[in-house]
Amino acid sequence: MSNSRNNRVMVEGVGARVVRGPDWKWGKQDGGEGHVGTVRSFESPEEVVVVWDNGTAANYRCSGAYDLRILDSAPTGIKHDGTMCDTCRQQPIIGIRWKCAECTNYDLCTVCYHGDKHHLRHRFYRITTPGSERVLLESRRKSKKITARGIFAGARVVRGVDWQWEDQDGGNGRRGKVTEIQDWSASSPHSAAYVLWDNGAKNLYRVGFEGMSDLKCVQDAKGGSFYRDHCPVLGEQNGNRNPGGLQIGDLVNIDLDLEIVQSLQHGHGGWTDGMFETLTTTGTVCGIDEDHDIVVQYPSGNRWTFNPAVLTKANIVRSGDAAQGAEGGTSQFQVGDLVQVCYDLERIKLLQRGHGEWAEAMLPTLGKVGRVQQIYSDSDLKVEVCGTSWTYNPAAVSKVASAGSAISNASGERLSQLLKKLFETQESGDLNEELVKAAANGDVAKVEDLLKRPDVDVNGQCAGHTAMQAASQNGHVDILKLLLKQNVDVEAEDKDGDRAVHHAAFGDEGAVIEVLHRGSADLNARNKRRQTPLHIAVNKGHLQVVKTLLDFGCHPSLQDSEGDTPLHDAISKKRDDILAVLLEAGADVTITNNNGFNALHHAALRGNPSAMRVLLSKLPRPWIVDEKKDDGYTALHLAALNNHVEVAELLVHQGNANLDIQNVNQQTALHLAVERQHTQIVRLLVRAGAKLDIQDKDGDTPLHEALRHHTLSQLRQLQDMQDVGKVDAAWEPSKNTLIMGLGTQGAEKKSAASIACFLAANGADLSIRNKKGQSPLDLCPDPNLCKALAKCHKEKVSGQVGSRSPSMISNDSETLEECMVCSDMKRDTLFGPCGHIATCSLCSPRVKKCLICKEQVQSRTKIEECVVCSDKKAAVLFQPCGHMCACENCANLMKKCVQCRAVVERRVPFIMCCGGKSSEDATDDISSGNIPVLQKDKDNTNVNADVQKLQQQLQDIKEQTMCPVCLDRLKNMIFLCGHGTCQLCGDRMSECPICRKAIERRILLY
């Protein structure tokens, strides 16, 4: 590997952590001064790709102009063997070495140097790589210090561009918090971040290791301060020279006797017979290895490694420069000199190593004449040739004599014409570049001057952008007005199809959008991803720009290439404020994206309760809450499937969602919740009145699903136990017992069994058979669970609390009065707000959720004696106030709670608060419940007829308003023939699907 390659990988290496440099001109792409990024790769010798911690990735200059500084090169793995940081004792120092210039043998690592260790008045040498030149710096006491920001401890992050860890974070868009910056490996310090995700998972992720960026910060954190001007500039070539004076590209000879050469070669590559060619031939230095031995290439193509003491730099005389040689350390060229590039492709490739490197784009410059623009400190030349600028090894070019000297007048005239043509072209390009740069920087005076020039192109581009686009993104309204007076093309597109209005939306420039609107810019313009400016403003979170666009009539519901509307994007970005603004502007909730999700589906899928709350509060038509996807899933199905409890609660209680809608597999939301063992969703749906006996396409009810899941989990556990070791004969008699007892082991089994019991206790039919002829009990091999299910179902159906024997009641009462935690003390603590009594006062502080209903415990009240008679303990819960302050005898006499004076609407006995049933209340409930049930059955006939009528009317309305092509979305685009479709289908058509006339114009409906 050549020395330049070593330096580029290590000094300017992949993985280095960087900040903006001295020639930075890219605004806030990095997030602002002090924000940190990671070197990802090198596009060319002059361009480096950086991924900033905020997620932005772009190319930056690292030759000629320097956009970046290296904050910390430790992640690249560069190490200074034999050194030690005298403060933190890191050994060896990895990254940049800082050596005190005033103390003997005192070194610091990067962290300690910027952390103000050692004397601040002392000056230091900066040593970027082993063997590189030492750079003397000013004392830190006199230098400017700024704060680093990005992915540091405390930052909030999401997955980044190199994420490959599946759903460790809980899913795309889920957030986590960086707790510490750590080492990904021992040889790559500070190259990883330890993250605690919001879902509770935690792990180490790459931030710099091999250029990888697993994370992107959504809320940066401070990472300490650093001395900006002391950080090396990324791309400066300080390390290409060898201590012996040789550098890559130098021509060398061997002038010593054979015996001496052979002696010097010991330990430096040795000597072989094939090396005799080197004694009489000039070679070219093509590399310098880690031991500072020199790798030389010869015309034969062979490469040999030499001790530097063997080689002598060749003294080459150029044509047109007979009096000057290449030695002496001073350049033979001056700025403005005309030079001719070498014709030999292979030779120039070799010479360019370590001198700007070779790029295929340089091919047109071979043999061409150019002008020296700049001479670097290492004598490399920046040459303007063929309309571009390249860095060349001085050995790769030769001076061109003037027209009045050695060459003929005719040749001089031809050369003059060539150069004139060359630089006229370059001047024209520079003029457009200056205009774009001046517009981007807000330089009104310069823009005015440039616009007065007749040869300026007001629509000319620099780096793919026009002056209009640059001014729009940076908010320079005065320049926009100047450009509009020059009849600038406001609809000009960049390589991504973005127009000026897109750039204004990206830059959060509402005033610019107002100016562009007055200039007749299309606010609904689409880029190559079919995004409108509104899409971009929503994605960037620019609320004011969103309002401005909508105020000026921007369509709120156009779809991008993925079918997403701005509503979808606002939900994904969790911007409820923007979501509300879009809905106020009439954004269509029913439009579905390419995956079939409308806004409600999307919010349910994402588990975004705040967005769901906003959507439900502003639904234009209440039945939209039950809209189905192509697969029959409603928003409630999606919430149940993904265990988004808050979203499901909103859909049930606020949206009044139909609980019994079936998907294409005829599954209800309850089927899905039971199948996935989502206990809270099951409880919610059952208590809200979901039907328990609806059958899916296989004839299974939710109870079938629960018991099948329970049995399968038992079999899996049995298989696991058998995998550990063979079951011997002694186990055979008890195998059935083992299977039956598995139901009590493991949370998964408990969950399935408890769901089954809950369904049975709420009236699920145990006798319904599926298409295989199986009842729920046929799927349950556990006799104990079967008995429990039968008992729960029987109690629900017959209300047999009153028929139970006194001994059973007595035993049940004793059990119900025991603390559910310790079983030693009696229950004496009332949980609020649920009103259950589950533990004693000693155990209650340890309980976060009620052990009976699983609701969050917000208050704990110890049950004292009756406040009226003081003879017995309080034993009746008053509703709705939730106080328990009187015994049974006294409570029956009260019409108001003696504690809060609220009217008592219901009295709940102590035993019911413990999870049991009161015989008295059970009888009352049954007797009072019979008549409404019968009445409800009578009413159902009339209700069903009304519902069928309304459904038919709704179907008629849908046929009139739905797109005739996809039958999913509302018509919102009309053609000149009078027919219409939805916007997504209309964009893809060239003729009307109804009358087959060619589509001349598409008109969007508002």
Swiss-Prot record:
Residues 935-962 form a coiled coil. A zinc finger (RING-type) spans 819-854, 866-901, 963-996. It holds the Pfam family Ank. It comes from the Eukaryota. Interacts with CEP131 and PCM1. A zinc finger (ZZ-type) spans 80-132. This is E3 ubiquitin-protein ligase MIB1. One of its GO terms (cellular component) is centrosome. The gene is MIB1. Zn(2+) 1 binds at residues 85, 88, 109, 112. Pathway: Protein modification; protein ubiquitination. ANK repeats lie at residues 430-460, 463-492, 496-525, 529-558, 562-591, 595-627, 631-661, 665-694, 698-729. E3 ubiquitin-protein ligase that mediates ubiquitination of Delta receptors, which act as ligands of Notch proteins. Positively regulates the Delta-mediated Notch signaling by ubiquitinating the intracellular domain of Delta, leading to endocytosis of Delta receptors. Probably mediates ubiquitination and subsequent proteasomal degradation of DAPK1, thereby antagonizing anti-apoptotic effects of DAPK1 to promote TNF-induced apoptosis. Involved in ubiquitination of centriolar satellite CEP131, CEP290 and PCM1 proteins and hence inhibits primary cilium formation in proliferating cells. (Microbial infection) During adenovirus infection, mediates ubiquitination of Core-capsid bridging protein. This allows viral genome delivery into nucleus for infection. The lineage of its organism: Eukaryota, Metazoa, Chordata, Craniata, Vertebrata. In epilepsy brain tissue, levels of expression are increased in the cytoplasm and microsomal fractions (endoplasmic reticulum). InterPro entries: Ankyrin_rpt (IPR002110), Ankyrin_rpt-contain_sf (IPR036770), MIB1/2_ZZ (IPR042056), Mib_Herc2 (IPR010606), Mib_Herc2_sf (IPR037252), SH3_15 (IPR040847), Znf_RING (IPR001841), Znf_RING/FYVE/PHD (IPR013083). CDD domains: RING-HC_MIB1_rpt1, RING-HC_MIB1_rpt2, RING-HC_MIB1_rpt3, ZZ_Mind_bomb. PANTHER family: E3 UBIQUITIN-PROTEIN LIGASE MIB1, E3 UBIQUITIN-PROTEIN LIGASE MIB2. Ubiquitinated; possibly via autoubiquitination. Ubiquitinated; this modification is inhibited in response to cellular stress, such as ultraviolet light (UV) radiation or heat shock. The modification Phosphoserine is found at residue 408. GO terms for molecular function: ubiquitin protein ligase activity; ubiquitin-protein transferase activity; zinc ion binding. Its main location: cytoplasm. Its EC number is 2.3.2.27. Residues 6-74, 143-221 form the MIB/HERC2 domain. It catalyses: S-ubiquitinyl-[E2 ubiquitin-conjugating enzyme]-L-cysteine + [acceptor protein]-L-lysine = [E2 ubiquitin-conjugating enzyme]-L-cysteine + N(6)-ubiquitinyl-[acceptor protein]-L-lysine.
